[in-house]
Amino acid sequence: MGLRAVMMFPIGVLVSLTAAGCGAGLKLTRIEAATNKPSNVAVFFAVDRDKEPVADLLASDFNIFEDDKLVSVDESRQTIVSPQLASAHYTLLLVDMSASVSASDQLHEISAAAIQFVGQVGKQQRVAVYAFDGSKNLYAISTFTPTEQQTAQGLNSIETFQSRDPSTNLNGAVVQALHELDKALGAADVPLRFGTLVVFTDGTDRANRVPLQEMVDAVEASPHAVYAIGVGNEIDDSTLSRVGKSGYIRVEDASASAAAFGEIGERIVRFTQRYYLLSYCSPARAGKHKVTIEAVKDGDKGRLEYAFDAQGFEPGCDPNKPPPFDTTGKTRKSRERMMATGEEAPAEKPKVEAKAKGKVSTEQ
């Protein structure tokens, strides 16, 4: 059965960010920037072209200008620092294990698809897998910080999972999964953090433990990207689109689930690879300056700008030094939303309190 992909909001919207300045085809969006003594300047940003992420750029693909004058590579010692020094990328896979799934003859295909997904995304991010049925609680299949052996054991347990409640607590599971993702990212020891939730389900909410609107509000209020994969005819596009605000795929049966997981996984990986942490040593020693970073790729160009104060700058710069990015909660929340949605952070809105009704069970 062929893969049927439906995007309520095209994936391009997710990765099309507003550039501070752009050339013919590249868009650069500044996520964070900072200076540090003795003369370090670091900028964390995303690169896109035609609403698609641009990966694998090298330090030599960027030109750095200060006050519109090119800074030589020998002088700047510009380098691409590992984004992991400043950012954390977490993905939570939420798998429907209600009776219609756990008691079906398609469980093997679903389990294999989940294992494939974790292997694919886990090379770039930390990945956790949680299951839900009709119960109030989520079930931790594999957490964000397990050993490799624990991960393998957890994923293998999907195939032998026994549903405690045959109903489907989809709404409650999504709200609680977002809470788990928030909690995990909150414990990360880096200033830049973003998460992704991927929901796999074969049906609509039947348990009615959490109202639909509460789930929708939680998804919309979350700074994280949320994808949905629906299998079968019970779940409709309307429900999938409200869960998968970043995009969704509906397939006819579980035999196509591997392709669906693969497509979502590829998008997540590419989305991660669009981020760059460019660091260099400024030749300035005093005064306020404008730095312009220009990316050049296959004839296309794009630019971003950042103003900084070089007061007290002096020799001795190491461009590989981790940048002192802001870690305050409010600033981080705006950055997370911008990174997850691909849009500039909106004006502050009243916070929607979506309480996680339930807890996580570690029993399989």
Where are these regions (language model features)?
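VWA/integrin I-like adhesion module and closely mimicked acidic/polar interface patches used
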Residues: F200-K245, R250-V251, A260-I264
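DG-centered beta-turn motif at the end of beta-strands
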Residues: F62, D96-S98, I110, V129-F132, ...
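Acidic, polar low-complexity linker/tail segments
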Residues: L26-L92, M97-D105
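C-terminal "exit" segments of structured domains
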Residues: T35-S39, A254-E348, V352
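Von Willebrand factor
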Residues: N137-Y139, P146, Q150-G195, R206, ...
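C-terminal motif of bacterial Sec signal peptides marking the signal peptidase cleavage site
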Residues: A20-G21
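…and closely analogous acidic/polar surface helices at protein-protein or active-site interfaces
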Residues: R77-Y90, A99-V127, S142-Q150, R209
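Second-shell loop/turn segments in exported
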Residues: D50, D96-L107, Q116, N137-S142, ...
